């Protein structure tokens, strides 16, 4: 996220918004390492990652960047410990429940990329609801890659 912040700050200082990208893509990686470095449990690292994501979404929308793609949960993430996967599933629920109204107010369109069918019922429902509620929105397109893996694209 450091490069994103540097690019945005640089453009804002110069008031050169034409040089901002139309589409920003971020791989959410390193939350566990961050937590370990700060002597916190992995779940706290993921929570901090979600807080940073909220910030990035707001800045991206404020700057009128057209699309933001977040690679949040790969197909390989299912192989993590049961506790970590459970914490990530709870974060999905918490994020959408707390953010959906603001995202709707900001006219954000949400697209979930990846196989939704494998998610537990509540998570699957909240993902489908977010897509359906925002389908007609015309502002920022927020692509969230969940249960997504590049290997699936190769077949």
PLM regions and their residue ranges:
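Flexible, compositionally biased loop and terminal segments
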Residues: 1-155
């Amino acid at each position: 996220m450091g490069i994103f912040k540097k690019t945005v700050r640089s453009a804002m200082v110069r008031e050169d918004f034409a040089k901002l990208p139309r589409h920003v893509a971020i791989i959410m990686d390193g939350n566990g390492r961050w937590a370990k470095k700060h002597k916190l449990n992995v779940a706290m690292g993921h929570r901090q990652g979600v807080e940073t994501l909220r910030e990035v979404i707001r800045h991206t929308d404020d700057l009128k960047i057209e699309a933001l793609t977040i690679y949040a949960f790969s197909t390989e993430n299912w192989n993590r410990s049961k506790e970590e996967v459970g914490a990530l599933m709870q974060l999905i629920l918490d994020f959408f429940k707390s953010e959906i109204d603001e995202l709707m107010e900001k006219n954000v369109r949400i697209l979930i990329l990846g196989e939704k069918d494998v998610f537990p019922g509540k998570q699957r429902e909240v993902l489908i609801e977010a897509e359906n509620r925002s389908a007609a929105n015309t502002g920022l397109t927020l692509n969230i890659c969940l249960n997504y893996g590049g290997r699936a694209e190769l077949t």
